[in-house]
């Protein structure tokens, strides 16, 4: 699996998934979306040993206009987009969210949702936060599936989790 993502928090989250599922996931952090092109994706993948079963995932926030159009131009990639931001996925582990929300409000709502999130910092998860995320994945998946893809709020991160679950069952 190849996961391209823009932020450090996403990298830390995917590293947690890689350790939990014990699956070969290559994480390619691209800080800015402006440089994501089909050619760049292929160049990055060429630096790794590839198999015919490899999948490409793009984990990006949709808080900037035109991001979605840029991502859709990358062939054979599964979009794991969050609107407005990655923290929505974390929030869905703790609570339902159906109405439109701004990025700052998602983070504030996450911090207020449960005591383990009170001191949430981007790009790091405490042991308790990791345990909570792994234990409540199923709940978050169901909540995410109930949202309209690419709209605010929504997240497609559950698609990666479902494929990892399938991979583990093989």
Tell me what each language-model feature is:
Residues 1-11:
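Catalytic nucleophile-elbow at a beta strand-turn-alpha helix junction centered on a G-D-S/GDSL motif
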Residues 11-31, 38, 44-57, 62-170:
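C-terminal accessory helical subdomains adjacent to catalytic cores in phosphodiester-
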């Amino acid at each position: 699996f190849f996961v391209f993502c823009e932020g450090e928090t996403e990298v830390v989250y995917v590293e947690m998934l890689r350790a939990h599922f014990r699956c070969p996931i290559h994480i390619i952090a691209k800080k800015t979306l402006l440089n994501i092109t089909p050619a760049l994706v292929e160049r990055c993948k060429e630096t790794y040993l590839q198999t015919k079963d490899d999948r490409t995932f793009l984990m990006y926030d949709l808080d900037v206009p035109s991001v979605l159009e840029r991502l859709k131009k990358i062939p054979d990639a599964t979009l794991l987009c969050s609107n407005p931001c990655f923290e929505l996925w974390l929030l869905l582990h703790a609570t339902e969210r159906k109405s439109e929300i701004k990025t700052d409000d998602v983070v504030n709502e996450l911090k207020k949702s449960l005591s383990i999130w009170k001191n949430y910092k981007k790009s790091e998860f405490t042991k308790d936060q990791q345990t909570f995320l792994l234990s409540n994945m199923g709940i978050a998946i169901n909540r995410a599936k109930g949202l309209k893809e690419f709209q605010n709020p929504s997240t497609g991160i559950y698609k990666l989790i479902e494929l990892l679950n399938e991979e583990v069952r093989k």
